[in-house]
Amino acid sequence: MDWGYYAKPSKTFCQGMVNKQCSFPRGKVLGGSAVSNVMVYHRASPLDYDFWASSGNDGWSYKEVLPYFIKSERIQIDEYDHGYHGTNGPLRVNYTAPHSTVSEPFFRACEEKGLKRIDYNGKDTLGVSRVQFNINFNKRDNSAHAFLDPIIDIRSNLRVLLNAFAIKVLLKGSTAEGVEFVKDCKRYIVKARKEVILSSGSINSPQLLMVSGIGPREELNKHKIEVKNELPVGRHMKDHTMFFNLVFRSNEVAPNKTLRENLERYIKGETPLTNALGVENVAFINTKTPGKGLPDIELITSPPPLGVANKLQSILFFNFDSDVSKVFDGYNPLTDFSIYVVLLNPKSIGSVTLQSKNPIDFPVIDLNYFSDPNNEDIETMYQGVKYVLSLSKTRAFRDINATFIGHQLGCEDLKKNGSEREYWYCALRQFSTTIFHPMSTTRMGRSPKESVVDSKCLVHRTKNLRVVDAGVIPNIIRGHPNAPIYMIAEKISDEIKKYYGEL
């Protein structure tokens, strides 16, 4: 179900992980990473899309893409900004079941800091909100369930081939003619009468293009791959960085249920066991001009009893070193909750390159966090940490005795002898990891020198070949990419139908 990727070892982040490598989960399943993500439905800021359009990507302003967000959505919550949401689409959007006991105190604490309660997919982008999820009656909704399942048995022109692995796009000159793939240890070729569309995600689509001869000349030459189209494939990758070792202990205690009681609640679809991986509320803040402009930090709350990772989870899921993971032994799942800090607009640029010309070999993922020359990324995250710590001074947090207890293992000497900034910089490098949002590896744009696809997601200087996934996002958005990917797919579907005279 997961590709089992790990990012390239680093000296600037993931310092608490085995071999200083972040784990990098990607969905190896029908439906992709939407089957394994946290299901957050977030469109990001309208100005993100206006920037796409002003950068030369005609047709991608927020006004122009909003109908495609609305088209696929079926919102099932009671209070939302009307005019921004759809009610008849296949993709359900809902809240999880009842709030935890620390939910309302978090809202009130943020309000004391000047934030207002918002529909973050509506007219406001700065504020605090419950998380809108792709959930259908406490069950995950994703691209396979919402879009594919209803039509799979009734569409005569649709065939889904499972357990098949694409290894090359077949090119004749500059024209894509088909795809070569492997299934059950045998090679097959399928020819395309009209187009080949890659939707393998921000990691696998660039790998497939490069092994097919489309990519940076020096990278292809390095692996003795014939250069058929020189484009910056795999370059310009950006990802949201997350710091999650900010733990509070309060006097609000989650019910300590028996195994039988928990099983009964699970069968009935009741939280917290059917909650969205422990995520509940979000706040979007601007650390530089509070209350104004665009968000640069997202705060995510994770309440009891799923609010803190245990040692085993930290090792298996996040690849933490067994010594560093001891910090999680000191947390109590019944009383402790976490607030994650997410960097929304990073300046650091990563890449996807090849390990070899063999498409079976994993690609090389270089996240390159905290590498920007002015240290703006790590400083912004530090300001986000300070904001979270300041919540403990609010009346709302004092009322539940919410006390910060997070222990930044490996940075103790700096706490004693260094500055506060040095201490938290160390902690950020030690415990920060990915929130699994890689984008822009096959980004959209006008110039073949700076981008891979045009505004219709057609690969530059190539005929009959498109990429439609998070890789085409021109520049990282200030939010979770799942909803924008659905929007991109809806919009390009119309482009394709228009081109072939079917719309």
Map each language-model feature to its residues.
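N-terminal redox-cofactor-binding region of secreted/periplasmic oxidoreductases
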Residues: 1-503
